[in-house]
Structures are given as structure tokens and as C-alpha cells.
Amino acid sequence: MLIALELSTIWTIALPPITGAIIGYFTNDIAIKMLFRPYKARYIFKRRLPFTPGLIPRNQERLAKRVSDTIMGSLLTPEEIQNLARRLLKTERVQSAILWLLQLAIKQIRADKEQKTAKILAGILSDLFGQSLPRLLKVLARRDDFLEAQINQIFDRILLEFRLTDLQARQLADWLLDTVISPDILRQLLIDFLTDRNIQVIDEGFREKTSGTYWVVANIFGLRNTLTRLRTFCLDEKETANTRLKELLLSLEMRTRLREWLQNLSLQNLPISTVRQLRKTTRDTVRSYIQQSGAQFLQDFNQSIDWEKLAIVVVNRLQASTVVTDSLEMISQELALILERYLEEDLERIVSQAIPILSIDQIIIEKIVATSPKELEAATEGIVKNELQAIVNLGGILGFFVGTIQTVILLLR
């Protein structure tokens, strides 16, 4: 009897705290299950039972809308998205991304077996020289100062200072004496020049314009017979005439004189006014040619070149060039700085335009609606167990405390 009384007293004292602790500890799990279950509506005689499905499955779309509004209104505000974009688009990260893309492009070009890059480059070059440059040239050639500075610079630095070297002067003099004014050509020129009319004009002029001893010679002997005999000699005695002319050129040292004259030939020896006029004439001539025939020249030039072969050579050259590889980092850095300056000015506008395009709120709603109630329940339980375990433990402690108070009240009665 005493033992039974003691057990009853022990249960009276211990049961409320234990029961309260158990209820408090498992209340969260029970509440979560009550929120989500049943997952689907239950029907009896085609009538849906109350409280089916669970609270969250029944209002999943409205819950998704509220979650989306909360996230977009408090967490993913435009200002926060701008800050996120700034962190993501730091110069170092952007530079690394651009450098990676450039290196990837170089590798892709090297692995290109069909020469697609070369074909694209060939098309660009062909369009540039065949269409774009001729049209641009037609527009620029109308300006009065078109190529003025460039032509003047070429004239001053190249043409004005140009002089033949000793070797060049010797070769040019040899070519002139052997080809242009050879003895045979000189003989033929004499024959062509000494026509009857020219002989008569020379003879009459010599008679009229001489005086003194020369007048006596001109009027007694005259030049007609002499020039006529010279022409006859050149016609009848070709070899002898050529030999005499050659001896005359040698005796006059024409080769040496011509070489020295060519070597000393320079535009700098001309008067300043003549040089200026020559520069203007050169500029006008070049400009006139470009205006009239420049576009056609570029088009003909474009048709005469196999751009695809040239592009293949250029691409292969660039692939093997260390300059291209070494300059990738510098190029990526410059592009990153340009992008940074652009974002500093227009980041707010870009974000405001990007938010409607991204439709983040709609994505959140669609993801929540597409998630099954079972998966939502598992995710909620996982968060509670892993991140909110202290609340579960606190529920058990509070339940134990309430049960202890009940025990004290019972004992006081």
C-alpha cells in the first residue's frame, strides 16, 4: 500500500514536467506537418473534407507571391542589385574574364581547321578595300585640305631631299647613253631634224644675224651645203656616222659629265618660289588623280588580290606572334577600365532596365509554385533542424518548466 502510494506521488510529481517537455519539444514538428499535410485534398462523396489539403499547399500560389514581394522589397532592392553588380564587376574580375575570353579566342583560332577566322577576315578586308574605302575616299577627296599635310611632308622629306648616289648616277648615265641617246639614236635624230625646210631656216637665219667675219663666211659659203652633206653622210654611212658620234661623246666626256650632273641634281638647288610652285603642283596633281581615279584604283586593287590567302597568312602570323600573346593582358585591362567608366555612369539605368527583363520576382513565384508540398516540407524541416534547433530545444525547456509549475500547483493543493 505504501509502495503504491509512493509510485502515485512520484508520477504526480514527474509526469507533468516530462509530458510538457515532450509536447514542447515536438510541437514544431507537429506544427510543420499540420501546415503541409495532407498534401492533396481529400474527398468523401465528392465533397472536399475541411482542412484538406494543408494550409500551405492550399495557398501555395499566394504564399509564393508574398515571398517574392518580400524578397524583392527587402532583400533584392534595386540598390542591393546595383551593389551586387558592382562587387561582381570589379575591375580585377572583369579583366580576368576578358583575358580568359581573349585567350580562349586565340586557342579557338589555333584549333580552327576550316580557316573560318581567315574567311571572315578575308571578307572584312575585301569589303574594306572594295566598298568602304572607295566611298570614304570620294567623300574626303572633296575637301580642300585633303592629304595636304601628308603630301607636303612626303615632298619635303623625300622628294626635296632626294639625291642619286654615285652608283645610281653612274647606272642612270650608262642607261641614258646606251639606250636613250645612243650614237645610232643621235644619228637618227640628226636625220629627222635636218629636213630641207629646217636647213633653209638655219641657213637664212645664219646669214641674217651674223656680222663681221661670220657674215662673210655665212654669205660666201653658207650652211646649206654643210648641213645637207651631214645629213647625207648620216644616211649613207651609218656605221661610220655612229662611230664618229661615239668618238665625239667620248671626247666630250659626256658619260662623266652626265653622271656628275645627275648626282648634283636636286630640288634644293631650285629657287624657293619654284620649289613652292612644284610642291603645289605635286599636291594638286595627286589630289586630282585621287578624286578622279582613286576609288576605281582601290576597286581594281581589291580585285587583283586574293584576300583569303592573304588572310590565312595574316592569321597564321598572328598565331605565332608573341606580341599578340603578350598584349592580351594590356588589352583586357584597357577594356575593363572602359567598361568600369561606362558602368559608373549608367549602372543605375542598366539595372533599372535589367530588372524587368530578368523577372526575378516571377522566377521566385514559378520556382515556389513548381516545388511540391512534400519538398517544401522537407526543406522547412531541414532548416528547423539545422538552423533553428535552439528553438526546438527551447520549446522542450518551456514545456518542462510549465509542467513543473503544474506539479507545484498540484502539491500546494
UniProtKB/Swiss-Prot annotation:
This is UPF0754 membrane protein PCC7424_0748. GO terms for cellular component: plasma membrane. Its main location: membrane. Keywords: Cell inner membrane, Cell membrane, Membrane, Transmembrane, Transmembrane helix. PANTHER family: UPF0754 MEMBRANE PROTEIN YHEB (PTHR35791:SF1). Belongs to the UPF0754 family. It is found in: Cell inner membrane. Pfam families: DUF445 (PF04286). The chain crosses the membrane at residues 3-23, 391-411. It is a multi-pass membrane protein. InterPro entries: DUF445 (IPR007383), UCP032178 (IPR016991).
